[in-house]
From Swiss-Prot:
The gene is mltC. It comes from Photorhabdus laumondii subsp. laumondii (strain DSM 15139 / CIP 105565 / TT01) (Photorhabdus luminescens subsp. laumondii). This is Membrane-bound lytic murein transglycosylase C. Its EC number is 4.2.2.n1. A lipid is attached at C17 (S-diacylglycerol cysteine). SUPFAM superfamilies: Lysozyme-like (SSF53955). Pfam families: Mltc_N, SLT. GO terms for molecular function: hydrolase activity, acting on glycosyl bonds; peptidoglycan lytic transglycosylase activity.
Amino acid sequence: MKKLLALFVIAPILISCTSNKNSEYREEYIKDTNGFDILMGQFAHNIENIWGLHEVLIAGPKDYVKYTDQYRTRSHINFEAGTITIETISPIDPTTYLRKAIITTLLMGDDPGSVDLYSDTNDIQISKEPFLYGQVMDNNGQPIRWEWRATHFADYLIANKLQKRQSGLHVIWSVTIQLVPNHLDKRAHKYLPLIRQASIKYGIDESLILAIMQIESSFNPYAVSRSDALGLMQVVQHTAGRDVFKMKGKSGQPSRSYLFDPENNIDAGTAYLSILQNSYLVDITNATSRRYAVITAYNGGAGSVLRVFSSDKKKAAQIINKMAPGDVYETLTTKHPSAESRRYLMKVNTAQKGYHH
């Protein structure tokens, strides 16, 4: 039985708020968020109507989900588990739809801005540099770059690995493909030049950028989230995005297409880390303590980090500066009001250790 994924999505038709007045902006954002919740509720309801109860599957930070064939065929890449599952409930010639979806998924590029994950439009372009190249091996142990190899592998999977299950009124046909064991490192490697560029530009440690990308999206450039966070570093348009644009002397906030571009996303996410480090949390003098604060703030905001120690920002920094870094870590991972932020610091800190040379 498929688990019901949380609605980690962002509607492409949401209206961007451009008011310069904070109160007006917040009011408009609330309206947009409410509209988004309604739209996504409808989207999930439509998927449930087509696929049935317990079969709702929607894109998230670490899950690529694309529907085609009037929403009767879908491709799901679970970047955390390292699996690709292609499924169809098409009552007529299901293997034809599976075959096409397998080939398209294996050969898709890494341009999220060109793909609408919330429609059944077959808008995925076959790329000469497939996003999954090197992350999947065919039945002969070869990486898949060309259409002929993807086609042969699709035929092999349908002939040898085809699964069938009953779910409600539907027969679901599927094949599952395992990513290579080091798929996470393969994806991370693709973005190293951009990470190094941003690291030098903003003075942020490469290992921290890598760790945040791993925890936020598992290096999934198609990453979306219910909190309106987009792309590899899960940048939120109306908060971090606005701060970064302001720092760059730009008005407003970045668009969805801007943040779905990997270079822009890594630049914006790293720029926001630098704002946290060099502006919002600059009064924390110990580098390790400040790093813990920056990591937690990337998830839950700088204000909530400081309020753990005092309602007065200056006093909070003074209190932190009198504490050992280990005590700051302990406090943030046990006293922060958000359980998500508490876990986030633990996860990113652990992941960062894995990227130190």
